[in-house]
Amino acid sequence: MQDPNADTEWNDILRKKGILPPKESLKELEEEEEGKEEQRLQQSVVKTYEDMTLEELQENEDEFSEEDERAIEMYRQQRLAEWKATQLRNKFGEVLEISGKDYVQEVTKAGEGLWVVLHLYKQGIPLCSLINHHLSGLARKFPDVKFIKAISTTCIPNYPDRNLPTVFVYREGDIKAQFIGPLVFGGMNLTIDELEWKLSESGAIKTELEENPKKAIKDVLLSSVRDPVPMRRDSDSEDD
């Protein structure tokens, strides 16, 4: 097929008759090609700086044009905001000890969207010590959740020891779940996975456990009851 932009006598006649559109000027073609090339370069730059860390952006900033600098600065601010949000979410990682006077600041005013797990305990109660140990592991595993503990009577005067251990789960100052007394926790057989599952049911943490670990233990026990180990028959010991 003949190129309608070709500079031929026949094409000139067709243009005069209005059969062919006016020929694109060389300048227009060059501008169009330059625009496409600039777009390709910009896309290349975007792909480059989107893969960079904040430190790498700073090291390579002299290599970008003025237009790129504006785009990169916007991207830098976005990355910085994301980094700050991550640091805010991951600012805990341990169980904090508080007293009653700290309650309002550490629980009620803990922060928007923040989950708080409070363990009321007393020294000398073995199950309280076990739960404190488990909570330390969970605090490291879920650093975006605020885990705190307090001696019970410093927060609630005359709080009965029979209610210990007690765990309250809060979100934005409101109680979302409460676990009161040793029976709720299953006694000293409580595992860290079982405690993680309990807290996940309240919404405080996002567990990767697929089912209640206590259920698995029950299934094993029930299976052993249904299918007892057969008694050994020592038939060879009795000879006529």
UniProtKB/Swiss-Prot annotation:
Keyword terms, alphabetized: Acetylation, Angiogenesis, Apoptosis, Chaperone, Cytoplasm, Endoplasmic reticulum, Host-virus interaction, Phosphoprotein
Modification after translation: N-terminal methionine acetylation destabilizes the protein.
Domain Phosducin stretches: 27-181
Modified residues (N-acetylmethionine): 1
Stretches for region Thioredoxin fold: 92-240
Induction pattern: By heat shock.
Listed InterPro entries: Phosducin-like_chap/apop_reg, Phosducin_thioredoxin-like_dom, Thioredoxin-like_sf
Region span, Disordered: 21-42
GO MF annotation: an example: protein folding chaperone
Cellular localisation: Cytoplasm; Cytoplasm, Perinuclear region; Endoplasmic reticulum
One of the protein's GO biological processes: negative regulation of chaperone-mediated protein folding
Phosphoserine PTM positions: 44, 65, 235, 237
GO CC terms, sorted: cytoplasm; endoplasmic reticulum; perinuclear region of cytoplasm; perinucleolar compartment; protein-containing complex
Role according to the record: Acts as a chaperone for the angiogenic VEGF receptor KDR/VEGFR2, increasing its abundance by inhibiting its ubiquitination and degradation. Inhibits the folding activity of the chaperonin-containing T-complex (CCT) which leads to inhibition of cytoskeletal actin folding. Acts as a chaperone during heat shock alongside HSP90 and HSP40/70 chaperone complexes. Modulates the activation of caspases during apoptosis.
Family: Belongs to the phosducin family.
Subunit field text: Interacts (via thioredoxin fold region) with KDR/VEGFR2 (via juxtamembrane domain). Forms ternary complexes with the chaperonin CCT complex and actin substrate, leading to inhibition of actin folding. Interacts with XIAP (via BIR 3 and RING domain). Interacts with HSP90AA1 and HSP90AB1.
Name of this protein: Phosducin-like protein 3
Organism: Rattus norvegicus (Rat)
